[in-house]
A protein has these predicted regions:
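Non-catalytic interface/targeting segments
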Residues: 1-54, 58, 113-124
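CheY-like receiver
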Residues: 59-62, 107
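Beta-hairpin (beta-strand-turn-beta-strand) motif
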Residues: 74-77, 101-102, 123-124
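A short glycine-rich beta-strand->turn/loop micro-motif centered on a GG-aromatic cluster
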Residues: 95-105
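Binuclear metal-ion centers of metallo-dependent hydrolases, dominated by the metallo-beta-lactamase
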Residues: 104-111, 116
Length: 124
């Protein structure tokens, strides 16, 4: 078995802390962010309950490239999105997973290293 070292680009290194702070590379955030194609956007919604299918539709329809997967990091505890959101994302051929933010950050790095097109919505 051949083992090779895999270097993670600093720009795609994700870290999460329990103090309500997200760290992406050298930048820190204390609000909901959307990580999309290497760019971070701050999202005005403050709770997961405020997300609805129209928000995802508007982001997807204005994007140059749609992801294979959207990772939802729901903060310290795992929460789930409304089933209507799952139906909309499925109609676009996009998978999604909800998990706590620390797990979402680790999963995002792994999927990126596999070359998968992945977006993330992360609550600190």
């Amino acid at each position: 078995m051949k083992i090779t070292e895999n270097h993670i680009d600093k720009a795609t290194s994700f870290f999460s802390s329990s103090q309500g702070i997200l760290q992406i590379g050298e930048q820190t955030y204390s609000e909901l962010i959307c990580w999309q194609d290497g760019k971070v956007s701050i999202i005005p919604q403050t709770t997961i309950e405020e997300l609805n299918e129209q928000i995802f539709i508007s982001v997807i329809e204005t994007a140059e490239n749609c992801p294979e997967v959207i990772i939802i990091g729901t903060g310290a505890k795992q929460k789930f999105l409304h089933p209507k959101i799952a139906a909309v994302l499925s109609a676009y051929g996009i998978g999604f997973e909800c998990m706590n933010t620390a797990s979402a950050c680790r999963t995002l790095v792994l999927l990126q290293e596999e070359g998968r097109s992945t977006w993330a919505w992360l609550w600190p």
